[in-house]
UniProtKB/Swiss-Prot annotation:
Binding of S-adenosyl-L-methionine, residues: 81, 86, 130-131, 144
Name of the gene encoding the protein in the UniProt record: rsmG
Functional note: Specifically methylates the N7 position of guanine in position 527 of 16S rRNA.
Family, similarity comment: Belongs to the methyltransferase superfamily. RNA methyltransferase RsmG family.
Cellular compartments annotated: Cytoplasm
UniProt catalytic activity: guanosine(527) in 16S rRNA + S-adenosyl-L-methionine = N(7)-methylguanosine(527) in 16S rRNA + S-adenosyl-L-homocysteine
Name by which UniProt lists this protein: Ribosomal RNA small subunit methyltransferase G
């Protein structure tokens, strides 16, 4: 997938295709996703209404930039607090073979199932809280705008297989969140610039363990 820098405002489907090098079929599936998002959003407030006119950058590109950070051979991804499906459902459409979307809100879970059905995305929706949901051991766990790292890590650890990674897009609080999380967790941290948020960072975390526990 291309690493082309994202253009300025008025980012549309054709810009997304140029930036990420996706096929016409993938673009059509994302367009169907956009149509469903616009249809359902007034009733269940999936995303801020102000972001709908910039959905290709604010939501699709923001999610798609994580694809290149997945380990080679990633098969199972668990997305926590999926909401409107970002980033998990976009990553499923882009080609992750098995994605599990954890979303406790029943209405949002219904939306996710409908998008997965219409687009043919390989996604399973779990209408449960992350503390109770069950999924296969994951090669990667993702979450966007769900919680502080200190709260995310114990949730993610439930699903990660040994050697798995976490991908968390974060805003300007990333450094502070890492400092707090390291009080209770050890981890290897890789930080990448966000292509959609100049003040944000993409965190790729591996070798995650509660502080004091040996990684086996």
């Amino acid at each position: 997938m291309s690493n082309t820098r994202l253009p300025a405002p008025s980012f549309r489907a054709t810009d997304f295709q140029a930036a990420f090098g996706v096929s016409r079929e993938t673009l059509d599936r994302l367009a169907a996703y956009e149509a469903l998002l616009r249809k359902w959003n007034p009733a269940i407030n999936l995303v801020a209404r102000s972001t709908l006119d910039d959905v290709w950058e604010r939501h699709f590109a923001d999610s798609a930039q994580l694809f290149a950070l997945l380990p080679e051979g990633t098969r199972v991804l668990v997305d926590l607090g999926s909401g409107a499906g970002f980033p998990g459902l976009v990553l499923a459409i882009l080609g992750v073979p098995e994605v599990h979307l954890i979303e406790s809100d029943g209405r949002k879970a219904a939306f996710l199932r409908e998008v997965a059905r219409v687009t043919g995305a390989p996604a399973t929706v779990h209408a449960q809280r992350a503390e109770q949901a069950e999924a296969p051991p994951a090669d990667a766990v993702s979450a966007r705008a769900l919680a502080d790292l200190s709260a995310l890590l114990p949730l993610a650890a439930r699903f990660l297989r040994p050697g798995g990674i976490c991908l968390f897009p974060k805003g300007r609080t990333a450094a502070d969140e890492l400092t707090r999380a390291r009080d209770s967790w050890t981890m290897r941290v890789e930080e990448f610039p966000s292509r959609t948020d100049p003040s944000g960072a993409l965190l790729r975390l591996s070798e995650i363990a509660p502080r004091g526990m040996q990684i086996g």
